[in-house]
A protein has these predicted regions:
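RNA pseudouridine synthases
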Residues: 1-160, 211, 231-254
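Pseudouridine synthase
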Residues: 19, 84-92, 118-121, 170-223, ...
Length: 254
């Protein structure tokens, strides 16, 4: 069946004419990749996604072979079984035919996510992340307060996991992770009795959202990339002061 016919058949609210318009605009994805040819044949087993009017994704910085964007809280990084929500990866593929995810954030976490533009760059960045060469700094609101910098060195699922927590103000903390285990920050903070606010899974105090934000990525290949701090976290800075720098020596990415 032609793609425009398949879209009209699977999405009763869309006419075939509207389907062709969406296809031409690059807002129809076949198996997670945009297709702009209405006459393309698709099989019943092909996964079709209609992007419609896409929300704007803020590009924080970019290079020849990479792009960094600001992920909103609640948006999955990758396609999920629940097709009701379009993923960040799918939306970027509308604009960038070739895009490769090199690390992940949990769906409820906001902040900077790095994508590669080529397979070669993806392999290189994946290796850098796996080896801990790219510095990853988060902001979190936790249950209770901590008085001094705390290092949590505790395996997760049998694998090494290292987290450094620095108090900023009241329950706001800066978190640096040296490894990248699943839910690492959430697991480690809960393990010391200070779960992330809004984290139902690990017993965090009530909050409008998971109060965890991927603030900065730093490496000589990308410079320093910073995601704007959401109001629910930035409101906690005293007297409108600017957040403290994470580390010197990295030029800010433009």
């Amino acid at each position: 069946m032609r793609l425009d016919q398949a879209i009209a058949a699977r999405f009763p609210d869309l006419s075939r004419r509207k389907a062709r318009e969406l296809i031409a605009a690059g807002r129809v994805l076949v198996n997670q990749r945009p297709v702009r040819v209405a006459s393309r044949f698709v099989a019943d087993s092909d996964q079709l996604t209609v992007a419609g009017d896409l929300p704007a994704i803020e590009v924080l910085a970019s290079g020849d072979d990479w792009v960094a964007v600001n992920k909103p809280a609640g948006m999955p990084v990758q396609p999920t079984r629940d097709r009701a929500t379009l993923s960040l990866e799918e939306m970027l593929r509308v604009e960038h035919r070739e895009i490769f995810l090199v690390h992940r954030l949990d769906t409820p976490t906001s902040g900077v996510v790095l994508f590669a533009r080529t397979r070669e760059a993806a392999a290189q960045f994946s290796e850098l992340f796996a080896g801990g060469a790219i510095r990853k700094t988060y902001l979190a609101v936790i249950g209770g307060t901590i008085e001094r910098e705390t290092t949590i060195d505790a395996p997760i699922d049998g694998k090494e996991a290292l987290t450094i927590v620095r108090p900023l103000r009241d329950s706001l903390v800066e978190v640096e992770i040296k490894t990248g285990r699943t839910h690492q920050i959430r697991v480690h903070l809960a393990s010391i009795g200070h779960p992330v606010a809004g984290d139902r899974r690990y017993g965090g105090p009530s909050a409008p959202r998971l109060m965890l934000h991927a603030w900065k990525l730093q490496h000589e290949s990308i410079g320093e990339i910073e995601a704007p701090i959401p109001p629910e976290l930035s409101d906690r800075w005293p007297g409108g002061a600017s957040p403290p720098p994470v580390a010197p020596g990295f030029p800010r990415a433009e």
